[in-house]
């Protein structure tokens, strides 16, 4: 007798529930992002304040690990703070602070009421001729230059001259709540509109829910000090399969080149003399990677680039008795990272030029804000106590004065009183060896720069402006008054370097090109993504050029955009276009009379052809190279060093800002209870259905299964 066969597959009722659950999950995954977009408005153009650490402490800001949320309150005048600090009934508050109120006094008030402050969003102010803002300290790089309590104590800690007199030190404070910069005016308007629609009460009364809120994510992984975070990272990387590094040292590369090529595979002979021309590449502000640095960095390194171009055009440079080295130091803002590393490498035979090879040292400080024709020559009074050094410095000053004699737009002036050097890379070299050196700057005492190391040290700060009717290409080639003034300084510098190198025949024919200066200023301060910058870079570096200005923060990923662009700008301005093919350019060792020990070779995009249809790539041969700008403290694992910079940057998982409407605590509690009740009810229903599945869901007979 035939019988029906019993099925051994999954229970049909359970299978139905699984399919239902899968459908719900799938719908959630598909619609989750859509729901999130309807709830939150992301703020995409923001810059956070992040945590930095050194040997002794931490500075900067952070949010809690899950982000900080607060009801938005707009503070347009100081009286508006009262609502945030005492009167407002719905703390914590997310303060939308007008840029002009981002001061030490107001920040101290907010810092003292952390239980009522969830965070801060700062808008961009519009600086005027009388305003000032510098979040840096009044004595930059204090303790890491040449002056100390044991050497030149009368000059230590800026006792005689507060170089950054307007500095409020905010960038070196530690804040327990997140602080973001709102860079987009349209996003700021959206936030203010949300605030006006939902957070303004009637007749002085408290506003009703829902309220407009903001959430900021900027949780930092590192705490306490560099020594602590580096030790934790070291332990993680040693014993963990998936190590979680919590901080990284600030580092990048110095850019350097020689007037005459040298063999970089070995060191120079002791009797070879080198004149050093130096400046810095980096700046910073209170906010991460917002460092326009127009006066504090860009004007000086643009001037040096133009001077290098002018000097290389002199007909007899290959026969000069002395060589000239152009150096662009990275990380000088953070206790002289770049210069201290180069000195360390020179002392330890890791750099082709040694300290004993240095004949003289000329550094460009801040040079774009001359209030008159004067350019001041700063020297070190301590090293000049040595009679030999004093005579060498005197010769150096005389040479500079003579070089400026035929450029009436620049008057080189000596200081009338004994004064310390301003913050400068020269100080790190003087710590290692007495050399004749000078720092050229637009100030005799305190900085003229009212926005030193701030978000407002922009093109406008050094009067780089353009007619409104011009196209970007016309702006690129428009020679501004600032470009002309800096070209004059570059001419004086180039002529001085020529004379210091032993040149005599062509001094007056050396002339910096204002067109070069104006293109560089436009590219670094206004629009990096321009036709000239594109033509001088490799094809794979195009993405480094943004439609806005470049930022000059040293960071931890290197080389940075600024380093690359300066490297290639210097190579194109001072190098020679060869007829090598792309393959030969990338491997010149196979080409007769070409040497990687003497030169660097770069295959760049080149200019457009006459029809503007394709570029004409070319191989540029130059002496431009990169040298590591990582503090020796990290090479030596001396994370608590007081000799070298120990600055490190914390890592983070997510940087995010968004606004949304928030319900009252009571409604949130009710929603939670209702949701929990629904969950419990659904579990009970699911249990009951599953328990009665054999009754509710009857398995169908298999076709053809018949009993007789």
From Swiss-Prot:
Record PTM: N-glycosylated.
Lumenal-side segments: 35-668
Q: Which residues are glycosylated?
A: 44, 54, 128, 186, 203, 263, 386, 434, 463, 507, 529, 561, 572, 579, 593, 611
An example of a GO molecular function for this protein is: endopeptidase activator activity
Tell me which family the UniProt entry assigns to this protein: Belongs to the nicastrin family.
Q: What does this protein do?
A: Essential subunit of the gamma-secretase complex, an endoprotease complex that catalyzes the intramembrane cleavage of integral membrane proteins such as Notch receptors and APP (amyloid-beta precursor protein). The gamma-secretase complex plays a role in Notch and Wnt signaling cascades and regulation of downstream processes via its role in processing key regulatory proteins, and by regulating cytosolic CTNNB1 levels.
- Protein name as annotated: Nicastrin
Q: What is the lineage of its organism?
A: Eukaryota, Metazoa, Chordata, Craniata, Vertebrata
